[in-house]
Amino acid sequence: MSLRKIIHVDCDCFYAAIEMRDDPRLAGRPMAVGGSPDHRGVIATCNYEARAYGVRSAMSSRHALKLCPDLLIVKPRFEAYREASREIHTIFRDYTELIEPLSLDEAYLDVSDSQWYSGSATRIAEDIRRRVARTLHITVSAGVAPNKFLAKIASDWRKPNGLFVITPNEVETFVAALPVARLHGVGKVTADKLTRLGIETCLHLREWSRLALVREFGSFGERLWGLARGIDERAVHNDSRRQSVSVENTYDTDLPDLASCLARLPELLDSLNERIARMDSSYRPDKPFVKVKFHDFSQTTMEQAGAGRDLESYRQLLGQAFARGGKPVRLLGVGVRLRDLRGAHEQLELFPPK
């Protein structure tokens, strides 16, 4: 089995965290993001105060209010969540391009070949958590392990706002005590069947031969045999093509005016050009853009087709973006949209010359 370094990052009650960040009045009271109880709405997520009452995701809003009469249910703002997710992925890409998103708030990262912190996956995970908290003012939990199966379990081990590491030497002991209900792919039906067979932990599961498990559970028995031993060879898949490359910085002190923002442009562009230089040849830089997040977390993005990637072009874009808010700035970003040359080539291949 190849030795890999996998991080699973999971935002803590993501939608609710964004709502509490943007409206501090929601913090400290039971709240949820979801649909109206009058229209058969469903809870998308809730904060930990609401979970203490038994409120859970996918529960009907009406039932949630019965459990917690003081529950405040707010409508989802998916664009705000998507934007936060994009910011988190921008942070991820500083450490690796091998990112497999599972949802807006959850992803696997393969940092096996990362040079950051001398290749320490634990320190990379710590840095990601620190940067997300500093930049987005929300918390994430992370798990570090030699494979995806264990990394996902690890990220849940010390939720919320926790980090748990399973080293290769700890795998056998850790997995042996693991309840089989925690195994990837084991739902209620399979868990109940395992219990009836007297299999409650992975140590019990190891007593069964591979053949016996296949006879009892079909092809899934093969996977159960491997998981009971901490084996999971699934790779971190990143099939999506990049749409842009960018760099951004959150400042410790808000930038008070346009002049102070413009003064930060050269260093941002230097970092952007370094990142562009590291891209593979299947991409070509296209439209430049700037991103401005104001002190109240409102934000805007300005881009222009046909503009250059020189300092003056970005100065003009930044001036237009700043004018939309005219308030102190907490974050500046610069980037460029990408043209996928590989995709264009493959599309042409579908229609060869006659």
UniProtKB/Swiss-Prot annotation:
GO cellular component terms, A-Z: cytosol
Predominant location: cytoplasm
InterPro entries: DNA/RNA_pol_sf, DNA_pol_Y-fam_lit_finger_sf, DNA_pol_Y-fam_little_finger, DNA_polymerase-Y, DNApol_IV, IMS_HHH_1, Rev_trsase/Diguanyl_cyclase, UmuC
Domain of life: Bacteria
Active-site residues from the entry: E106
Annotated positions binding Mg(2+): D10, D105
Family matches, as PROSITE patterns: UMUC
Ribosomal protein recorded as keyword: no
GO annotation (BP), single: SOS response
Catalytic activity: DNA(n) + a 2'-deoxyribonucleoside 5'-triphosphate = DNA(n+1) + diphosphate
Domain UmuC: 6-187
E.C. designation(s): 2.7.7.7
Similarity comment: Belongs to the DNA polymerase type-Y family.
Name the UniProt record assigns to this protein: DNA polymerase IV
Gene: dinB
